[in-house]
Amino acid sequence: MKISLLQIDVAWRDARENIRRAESLMASQPCADLYVLPEMWCTGFDVSPDGHTLEQSKMGYEWMLRKAEELNASIAGSLAWQTEASLRSGRFVNTLFVMGPDGSVCHYAKRHLFGYGGEDAHYLSGQQRVVMQVGDVRVLPQICYDLRFPVASRNTAENPYDLIIYVASWPASRQTAWDVLLRARAIENQCYVAGVNRFGDDLHCHYEGGTTLIDPYGNSLFSLRGSAACASAEIDLQKMRQFREKFPVLKDADVFYKG
């Protein structure tokens, strides 16, 4: 599977402009099977969401559906969303959607809300671990702060996966943690890890990017930093399976999480 990661300079609460920027980056990387956008890619990381936030997110949602069909590819990215449960509490859900070329929609709700930044005041946390099938690849979707909590991303025999996707709005002030933790998740789970961060500035933070694809050995296949950019690489499932068979670390792992 060819995966393409989009490091967008996200315009604050401006879906039309962010769609234009995503279109431009996608055009530079044709023929991918899966395109991945950052966290809250069409609004920016909005910890005080309102009706305008939802309106912009709906525009992003509809565009992802159309674009997946147009490109005959899957498209992933998170949006500030509302569900029946969140509406009852007046909150939103930070939701990672994966749109398929056939019109299918899978989703994951962010489990670990960023209390330091106030996300927990306006969002509901998800409680469900989700593994999605994208082509031949089993994908575990995760969102930003989830990266700091490895138990929920443990690769298990009961619910295994091949690729973790982390979509993020991860500030430059904590860039080292981003770089190190992505490698750790790949090594400890013997899987590919796609870390897709935004670039640019919002009301509070500067973002350097650091978007990367890491193989099961912990090697970065590419790294984007310092500008809006897009890059692609292949997920080699045969190479990953051979490594797991030769060096079967996961069978000796502690059982913390069976979900």
Which positions does each model-derived feature cover?
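Active-site-proximal beta-strand elements of phosphoester/diester hydrolases
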Residues: 1-10, 14, 107, 137-146, ...
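Active-site beta-loop-alpha junctions enriched in small/polar residues
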Residues: 8-9, 80, 110-111, 144, ...
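Cys-nucleophile CN-hydrolase/nitrilase-fold catalytic domain and related Cys-dependent amidase chemistry
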Residues: 15, 23-101, 171-172, 176-191
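CN hydrolase (nitrilase-like) catalytic-core segments centered on the catalytic cysteine
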Residues: 57-76, 148-230
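Active-site catalytic loop in hydrolytic enzyme cores
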Residues: 87-159, 171-180, 242-249
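C-terminal beta-strand edge segments of enzyme domains
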Residues: 107, 131, 198-259
